[in-house]
Amino acid sequence: MSERVSARLRVTPCGSSTPAARRLISLRDAALSASQHGWPVLPGSVWRQSRYYNAITNASTNGLTPVVPRQHATVDRQQVRAWWQTLPHAVLLVTGKAFDVISVPMSWGISAAKHSMLRHDPAPMIVTPERMAHFLVTVPATLHVELPRWPRVVLAEPLSVVPAPPTRMDGNLVKWWITPNRTDWTPGDPALVQRALVATASGNAARET
């Protein structure tokens, strides 16, 4: 059963000039930017006192999760503004329509991103504090026949979520390794990303399982 906090979670007004308020504004701007480029978003749970909480119900959550149903993911600017006015704590990108996500251990993902194939034709890539790399690729994507040999290679199911910078996970920042601006907000070629992963799979990075 979910635990509940005793006090209502407070939201810092967006007009405030405190560091916390500036961080919330940066999260709102990240959500608006993603939605403007056709990437569906959802607000996520808040990290507080070493736990995640749903800012609507005050219940603790099992990790960083959406606080509204996944099927409500949207690119509507008005809805995004409304959500991040009261639920500004995390930005979650939702897979299946605008992009798919291929996830691998971070060091392997970085090795692949540095490979000549992706240096010339990069894919947006997120790295998380849990040391995972998430490549955003065009839909529909299917896994290369060799990649399922490594258990931590994951092709996200539709309506999966991936945290977008500057969201925090366990109190630490999620970051772009390859920003979407570098690719004109175009997801990468899934075949090319996977060829780069296969090409770098023999190194130590791929054995980080």
Residue ranges and their predicted role:
Residues 135:
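Catalytic core of tubulin tyrosine ligase-like
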Residues 139-209:
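DNA replication initiation modules
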Residues 2-130, 140, 194, 198, ...:
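Signature for HUH/AEP ssDNA processing cores
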